[in-house]
Amino acid sequence: MQKNDVVKVTIEDIGVNGEGIGKIDGYTLFIKDAVIGDVVEAKIMKAKKNYGYARMMQIIEPSKDRVEPKCKFARQCGGCQIQQISYEKQLEFKNRKVLGNLERIGGFSPELLEKIADPIVGMEIPFHYRNKAQFPFGKDKNGVTVTGFYAGRTHDIIANTDCALGVEQNQEILETILSFMEQYQMEPYDEKTGKGLLRHVLIRYGFTTKEIMVCLVINAKKIPHCEKLVELLQKIEGMTSITISVNQKNTNVIMGDSYEVLWGQAFITDYIGEIKYQISPLSFFQVNPVQTEKLYGLALEYADLKGDETVWDLYCGIGTISLFLAQNAKQVYGVEIIPQAIEDARKNAQINGIENAKFYVGKAEEVLPGYYADYAKAHPGEQAHADVIVVDPSRKGCEESLLETMVQMQPERIVYVSCDSATLARDLKYLCGNGYELVKVRAVDQFSQTVHVETVVLLSRK
C-alpha cells in the first residue's frame, strides 16, 4: 500500500478514537468517520509498514448501524467523533472499550468481568446535554466575523451557533453578540497578529435552576459600548451573570486568571440531586448534569455508607462527590490541587449546611501520604485509617505512591471513578495485587456522541 492509493474496504472494527478499522490482505487501515459494516472507498493519506491512515472518499454500502448525524458539521468539527453511529452501537463500543482495557491491561478474566459488570448507563436523550460551552470568535476566509468550533486538529473556526450537544439558549446569546459586534464594528481576536477584541465566549447553564452565565474573554481591559451589550444580553430569559475575563497573553489558554462582574451575580447556581452548587466562570463542574447525578448515585451506592464512616475523597474538585457522601458519612475529607476549587468546595458545603466535610488544597499523592506519616508520628504505634476512599483522578490516573498509602490505610471499600479506562485498569491491577478484589464495574455514558466514557468500580478488602 502506498500514499494516494484509492482502495475499497469493508469496516470490521472501531478504534479507541472512534475511527473505522478495515483490512486489505492483512494490511490495516484506520478511516475516520467510517462505521462497522460500511463498505467505503478510501484514499491512503499515510502508509506505514503494516498499517496506514486513509480518508473516506465515499460510502459504497452504508452499515445498518450508520445514522444521519444531527449536526451538519459533525464530520469537520472536532467536538463529536461518533455522531454517525447509532446510539445503541455507541454504548456497545464504549462498554467494550472499558471491559477490553480491564482485561488486556488489568489482567482480569472475561469470566469475572461478565459476572461483575453491569450494563452501561446510557442517556434517554443523548443530545443538548452540555451545561457549559466555550465558543472561539474569529473571521472566516471572506473576512466575516464568525463563532463556532474548531475543525478537528486545527484552529480554523467552523461557523455554527447551534451545536447539537449544547443547550438551545447558546444560539440566541451568540447571535446577540455577533450582531452587537457588527453594529459597533468590533473586531474578533486574531491569533496570528494578537490584535482584535473578543477571543471567546463562555456560556454556562443551570439545568435545574435555568440560570445563565455569559463570560466574555477579551484582549483588552474593557469592551467599548459595554452597557449596550449588557442591555441586550440581560433581556435573554434566565440571564443571571454577565462577566468579562481579560486575557492579553499570546496563548491557547482560553480564560484569563480572573474575572469581573459586568451585571448580575458572579456565579450561577445549580443542583446535583439535592445538593446546591455555586458555579463561577472558573469553576470546574461536570458538564453533563443528568448523567453526573447517575454517576454520583452509583459512587454513593458502591460506598455503601451507614453513617459512622470516615471517607477520603481524592481529586474532589469543587466537592461534588464529597458533599454527596457527607450526607451519609460521619466525616469526609476532600483533597484537590486547585485552590479556587477548594474555595468553591468550602462555600458549597456552607450553602448546604454540611459541617462534616473538610477540604485540603494539594496534590492527592502528597496530601494523603503526608497525612498518613504525620498521624503515625503523632500517635506512636497507630496508623491512620479510612473506612472508604473515593478517587476521581484525571486521565493519567493515580500515582503509585498514592495507591500505596491507600492500601496502608486499609479502607473496607475503594470506589474508583475514572475518565480513562486504560489508566483505571493499570491502577486496579496494583490494588488487586495488594489486598483488594474487584467487586463491581459499570460504565456511564457521560459524553454522548464522543469516544469518551466514565467508569465507576468498587473494590473490597479481601
Language-model segments: what does each one mean?
Residues 1-73, 358:
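Terminal RNA-binding accessory module
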Residues 2-8, 16, 221-462:
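Rossmann-like S-adenosyl-L-methionine
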Residues 20-25, 148-151, 215-217, 345:
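Short, acidic/hydrophobic/Gly-rich beta-strand patch recurrent on exposed beta strands
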Residues 118-126, 191-192, 200, 204, ...:
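Short, solvent-exposed loop/turn elements at beta->coil junctions and helix N-caps
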Residues 157-199, 220-246:
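Internal alpha/beta scaffold segment
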Residues 202-206, 211-222:
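Carbohydrate-binding surface patches
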